[in-house]
């Protein structure tokens, strides 16, 4: 990592500047880049600077604090009780590890089986559950070490790969979830970020329309489900379509069926009936107002607020965590996941830790409160699995870390909208035109038609940014 006090460089050449980065950093960027879909210019802010604003920090980049995530395996009789281990690991290792647990055949991919965590017990667990705490990388867990006692217990009683990383950059939700599901990195599976260059040349949003057509390869859920003749129950409850990359493709692929998809979004749980199914009782699932009222009373003052913030109009508080946990447990119970002889798969994402990191910052007490709420939800899920399913395995990870407050690091935000304006100003672009089609968390999608008109090259723009 470059020292924070080195603010000037001897060269503006993008090749020279890129080669000055470590091999580890360059490898992460290479894994996360697709020449057809990614930004045309990739930016790597010098630590502790970051993309975003003072108010809304960004978490996309190759640096260690954004890359290191928990990767904890737990399952009575299925996962070895060895605590923290130093073995290298990545989220792409989840793909072959789930297949190994379930005794299924999947296509060989980039990840490796986390065999040191598995006991090799006979048979297969009745349920394998993958839980993602969105944005809760090791930096966040280290910041609030007392907020997650249930996860800490899983670390002690299972196997925790404390050096695990997401392995690619940008460290962003759609890309990492697809890496979890497919066992390969974005340069292979094709999901490079929230925004990407579509085949028609326009900048589009990943998983638009709640389909997985953007993903070039199948997931472990697809393959394991078909390996068992579509007999397993395969389900996911998450927050947004960005999380679908780790799930199945449903009936969108040959041989697939209508697996169960439930996305909470903004308070109404919905799915995509074209390729998936969703239990009807989830559509108007009750309890959000009840959870909001309970949280409202917790500070002794009934004013509709938590820590001074509206509860129901936002999604950055424990009420939403508890509501998701209630709905998820209802789905597990009523659909009978793990309650017959056919092994099942269930996946979930708790988004609130990430939302709080963006809205308030990972160093603020709101983050501690939401992280603890997610840990309590984890405890509730484990209680149910222990009582009813008994033979199960849980894998918990995160999709990226978060950016600490610039007040603590001395970092300076790099606003991508401002970069777009700066480029146009520097190259004297006529009013109403732009050299950029769009910007993303890590770079610029260039407008090649305008560049040709003004006789400006990629290299010139990159040198200006350097």
Residue ranges and their predicted role:
Residues 1-49, 133, 146-148, 156, ...:
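Secreted, luminal/periplasmic, and some membrane-associated catalytic domains
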Residues 2-7, 12-19, 38, 45-46, ...:
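His/Asp/Glu-rich, glycine-adjacent segments
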Residues 37-38, 44-76:
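C-terminal, low-complexity/hydrophilic appendages and adjacent surface loops
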Residues 43, 71-72, 94, 98, ...:
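Beta-strand elements within well-structured catalytic alpha/beta cores of enzymes
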Residues 57-60, 80-88, 101, 116-119, ...:
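Second-shell loop/turn segments in exported
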Residues 108-113, 117-160:
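Active-site-proximal N-terminal segment of extracellular/periplasmic enzymes that hydrolyze or transfer
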Residues 110-115, 161-181, 236-246, 349-351, ...:
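Short, solvent-exposed turn/loop segments enriched in Gly/Ser/Thr/Pro and often Arg
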Residues 139-188, 233-237:
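Short, structured active-site-proximal loop/turn typified by the sulfatase FGly-forming signature C/S-X-P-X-R
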